[in-house]
Each structure stands twice: as C-alpha cells, then as structure tokens.
C-alpha cells in the first residue's frame, strides 16, 4: 500500500513486507517502522484508506451509520467506526468515513485521537480500477536520503 501526500507538507507513506516507511521530502529522510507484532493493527488502519471491504472493516471496527451527506456532489453514507482492538483505541478513538456506495470508495475520512485532535483526509479525482504504475510502490529517494529506524 502506498500514499502520496501533497499538502500541507509533502511526504510518501509505503507499507510493504511488514514495514511502514515514511519519506519526508522536505528533510530528505525516511523513517522505517517494523510492524512486527503490530502488523494486524497497522494493516487495519492502512486499509481504511485503501478500499477495505465492509467485511474487513467489521472485523476491526464497530460500524454505525450516522446518516447520508452530499460531498462534492456525491451522495454518501456517513459511517462512524470505533476500533475493536485496545492497542488501536489507545491512539485512535474513532473514524468518520463518507462512503460513495455506488463506487464503494471513501471520499472523506476524519480520524479522531483520544485527545480530541483529528486528521481530515478528502479525496478528489478518484479513478476506480485504473492502471497503476509499478513505481508508485517505490519511494523516490536519493543517495543522500537519510534512513532512520527508531527502536
């Protein structure tokens, strides 16, 4: 799984072979985290942004329909997801998803921390089942890029 973030600060996130890599382009640094025993938790969180099926979401989250909203002219179902895993609950209290039921994709996501802070993600120009280039799953680093592996 790969994510390219363009604002407010450009970065790339790659989850591959049980390792999460965060490339911060401004400081030219990759921070690598081994999922190890937390692999299931990492995969459940990453899948929120990558089209997990309803069955997969129900394995990891309590799901409540909060209503219908229109986002960018698209009729969406607003879902409130609460993590089932205690480890996930310690860093994520719940997630709001605005799902397009026709395309089965999330258009907007709001991740809430226990502190009340949140991160809002809004997807535009979504292409379903488009061709994906192989290089999207490689970080665009240089020979000068610093690699950090926190303990």
Can you say where each PLM-predicted feature lies in the sequence?
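Gly/Pro-enriched, hydrophobic low-complexity segments
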Residues: 31, 58, 64-150
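Short secondary-structure transition/capping segments
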Residues: 12-25, 51-60, 110, 114-115, ...
């Amino acid at each position: 799984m790969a994510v390219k973030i363009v604002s407010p600060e450009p970065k790339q996130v790659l989850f591959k072979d049980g390792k999460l890599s965060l490339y911060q382009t401004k400081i030219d640094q990759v921070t690598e985290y081994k999922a190890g025993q937390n692999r299931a938790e990492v995969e459940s969180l990453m899948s929120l942004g990558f089209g997990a099926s309803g069955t997969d979401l129900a394995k990891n989250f309590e799901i409540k329909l909060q209503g219908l909203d229109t986002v960018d002219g698209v009729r969406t179902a607003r879902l409130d997801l609460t993590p089932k895993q205690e480890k996930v609950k310690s860093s994520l209290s719940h997630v709001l998803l605005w799902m397009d039921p026709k395309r089965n994709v999330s258009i907007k996501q709001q991740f809430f921390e226990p502190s009340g802070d949140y991160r809002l993600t809004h997807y535009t120009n979504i292409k379903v089942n488009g061709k994906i280039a192989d290089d999207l799953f490689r970080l665009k680093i240089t020979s000068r890029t610093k690699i950090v592996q926190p303990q």
